[in-house]
């Protein structure tokens, strides 16, 4: 295989928070596969010479959608040099970047993971809320509020977590707020 896939974090949505490395890779891309959490302003950075492929997934979509995205990454890596898989936030903080990397590796596709600012940090910082503070919070944890529905049981033990960590950042938890807050 001659191509390489870059799993790139686009940051929390503000185009000024995307990394210089991400911009560089977007500008060199032959193909960009992007999801629904990537802002329109960042999508507009994709050069006209690159093929843009929307692979956005919505809440409730089955896993076949992700399988299709995985297949596209391999397919494009076989036929082009630079494939960018552009993901909102950071690709490996609840972004399936780890799963995508495993898939690429299983097909011997070269890949690189490029970090992005996760919304859990970016939104708190913009709001002026310190996730850690020497006087008040010595620990922080990022936890999903929406675990894989195919698991037999919930792994997150909310009551135990609430007693053991100073700051809890819950990602994708709005629809399960009633369960989480008990």
Model-inferred region functions:
Residues 2-5, 110-112, 118-182:
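Beta-strand/loop-alpha-helix module characteristic of Rossmann-like adenine-cofactor folds
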């Amino acid at each position: 295989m001659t191509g390489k896939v870059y799993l790139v974090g686009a940051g929390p949505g503000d185009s000024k928070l995307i990394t210089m490395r991400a911009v560089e890779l977007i500008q060199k891309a032959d193909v960009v596969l992007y999801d629904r959490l990537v802002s329109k302003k960042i999508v507009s950075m994709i050069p006209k010479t690159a093929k843009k492929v929307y692979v956005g997934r919505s809440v409730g979509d089955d896993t076949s959608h992700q399988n299709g995205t995985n297949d596209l990454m391999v397919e494009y890596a076989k036929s082009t040099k630079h494939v960018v898989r552009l993901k909102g936030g950071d690709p490996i903080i609840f972004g399936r970047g780890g799963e995508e990397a495993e898939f690429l590796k299983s097909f011997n596709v070269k890949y690189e993971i490029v970090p992005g600012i996760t919304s859990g940090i970016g939104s708190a910082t913009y709001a002026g809320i310190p996730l850690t503070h020497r006087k008040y919070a010595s620990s922080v944890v990022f936890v999903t509020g929406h675990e894989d529905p195919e698991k037999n049981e919930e792994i997150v033990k909310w009551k135990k977590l609430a007693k053991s960590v100073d700051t809890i950042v819950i990602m994708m938890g709005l629809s399960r707020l009633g369960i989480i807050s008990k």
